[in-house]
Regions:
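Short, surface-exposed connector motifs at secondary-structure boundaries
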Residues: 1, 25-27
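Short glycine-/aliphatic-rich beta-strand segments at the starts of folded cytosolic domains
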Residues: 1-8
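A structural detector for beta-sheet-dominated domains
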Residues: 8-10, 60
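Amphipathic alpha-helical interaction surfaces in cytosolic regulatory modules
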Residues: 12-25, 36-51, 70-71
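Cytosolic Rossmann-like ligand/nucleotide-binding regulatory domains
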Residues: 31-34
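C-terminal structural segments of small proteins and small subunits
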Residues: 50, 54-79
Length: 79
């Protein structure tokens, strides 16, 4: 089941922490913003997105909410 969340990365430190958490996951995650899709574990990819607004994060597996809670705005849906 795919989990989709909207998150906000407000600062450079938020991006660094988010990438670190994504690198610890045993599965991949993708970040979507305005038609672009990047790997959540790639810091340069994230910085290429418009981070002034929420971005959509898509996970291929269930995740531990404690890892993502600081960035979460709202849960969109499960697919």
């Amino acid at each position: 089941m795919t989990k989709i969340l909207m998150i906000m990365l407000n600062t450079i430190e938020d991006v660094k922490k988010f990438v670190q958490e994504m690198n610890n996951l045993p599965y991949g995650a993708k970040v979507h913003s305005r038609g672009y899709i990047v790997h959540a574990s790639r810091i340069m990819g994230l910085f290429s997105l418009d981070l002034s607004e929420p971005v959509k994060v898509e996970f291929d597996e269930e995740l531990t909410w404690e890892d993502i809670e600081p960035f979460k705005i709202w849960e969109v849906h499960d697919e």
